[in-house]
């Protein structure tokens, strides 16, 4: 590496480090202080601006994704999510929608806009596993990870302004641009994984505060690993920015033992969750029938052998006389 490129790389590294927003780490481990402590990272993006940006992204998702229209399922998911939000450090409103997609996934946009795939609902055995996934996403929103990323990007853009006045032929120009194009994305990926770890850390506390068994969150990791074994690479894209699943399991188990006191009982599931899964299965079955052109049984009137009979005195065809048998059900081929 040339001297100019080394200096340029160090320059960009210093700017990146200087641009990393801190966090008011106030009683982060104190579950009893949830809702009063400060876990959000400092950012030059205001909450109002973050919500406005998130609304723009959400509008695009709503147009492009297949948003589930079932009011019963949507109401249930929203109720579970809002209960978790009330037992979290989130300072902005939470909006959650369900995407009709069989993949196991959930994600959060800036400003508290959240999406949950139907595949996550179907993969869960109990309500507490769904709560764990939602609580993780609330952890992202509460810590304002999106605002943190946008702050870094904004500062980096300003940091690159002086490059406009340096001739492109200068070695230092090429060195800075190489560092910017190669080093910055790697730094963002690294911190994104730290964000995921923090979201796990906070999410476990939120579901515990809401009365759920935090071990259910660890249990759902088993679902992810099973899916990966059944279909290698299927989860790689979804969890590319996450730490390895095995590491997340170990870290979560340690957190549960250290800062989450055992309770005599937890909310595991509800009969409503079973109803929701049954309703989802019905929708899936109906969708499969429709995709095959099978809409189920249809009514057809039985005709007489003599379809060429002459009109009767009442003006009807002989085959349509009042002596016909009642209609019968026949399945469409």
List each model region and its residues.
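A Zn2+-metalloprotease active-site environment signal
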Residues: 20-284, 293
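Short acidic, low-complexity intrinsically disordered linear motifs used
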Residues: 293-307, 318-333
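Bacterial N-terminal signal peptides that target proteins for export
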Residues: 1-10
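Intrinsically disordered low-complexity regions specifically enriched for long asparagine
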Residues: 17-21, 91, 324, 329
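Extended, charge-rich alpha-helical interface modules
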Residues: 313-317
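Bacterial N-terminal signal peptides
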Residues: 9-18
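Long amphipathic alpha-helical segments used for membrane anchoring, targeting, substrate engagement
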Residues: 2, 24-32, 307-310, 326, ...
């Amino acid at each position: 590496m040339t001297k100019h490129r080394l200096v340029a790389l160090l320059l960009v590294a210093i700017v990146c480090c200087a641009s990393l927003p801190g966090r008011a780490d106030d009683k982060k481990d104190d579950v009893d202080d949830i809702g009063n402590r400060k876990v959000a990272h400092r950012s030059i993006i205001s909450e109002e601006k973050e919500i406005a940006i998130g609304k723009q992204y959400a509008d695009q998702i709503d147009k492009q994704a297949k948003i589930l229209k079932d009011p019963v399922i949507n109401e249930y998911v929203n109720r579970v999510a809002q209960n978790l939000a009330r037992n979290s450090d989130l300072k902005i409103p939470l909006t959650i929608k369900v995407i009709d997609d069989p993949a196991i996934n959930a994600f959060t946009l800036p400003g508290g806009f959240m999406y949950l795939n139907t595949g996550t609902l179907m993969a869960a055995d109990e309500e507490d596993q769904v709560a764990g996934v939602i609580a993780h996403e609330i952890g992202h929103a509460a810590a304002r990870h999106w605002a943190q990323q946008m702050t870094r990007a904004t500062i980096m853009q300003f940091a690159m302004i002086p490059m406009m006045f340096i001739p492109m032929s200068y070695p230092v120009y090429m060195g800075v641009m190489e560092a910017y194009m190669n080093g910055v994305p790697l730094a963002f990926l690294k911190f994104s994984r730290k964000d995921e770890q923090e979201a796990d850390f906070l999410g476990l506390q939120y579901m515990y505060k809401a009365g759920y068994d935090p071990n259910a969150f660890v249990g759902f990791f088993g679902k992810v690993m099973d899916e990966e074994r059944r279909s290698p690479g299927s989860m790689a894209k979804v969890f590319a920015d996450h730490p390895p699943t095995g590491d997340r399991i170990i870290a979560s188990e340690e957190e549960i033992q250290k800062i989450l006191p055992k309770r005599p009982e937890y909310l595991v599931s509800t009969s409503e969750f079973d109803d929701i899964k049954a309703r989802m299965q019905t929708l899936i079955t109906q969708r499969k029938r429709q995709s095959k052109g099978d809409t189920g049984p249809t009514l057809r009137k039985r005709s007489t052998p003599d379809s060429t009979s002459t009109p009767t005195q009442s003006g009807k065809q002989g085959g349509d006389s009042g002596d016909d048998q009642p209609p019968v059900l026949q399945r469409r081929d």
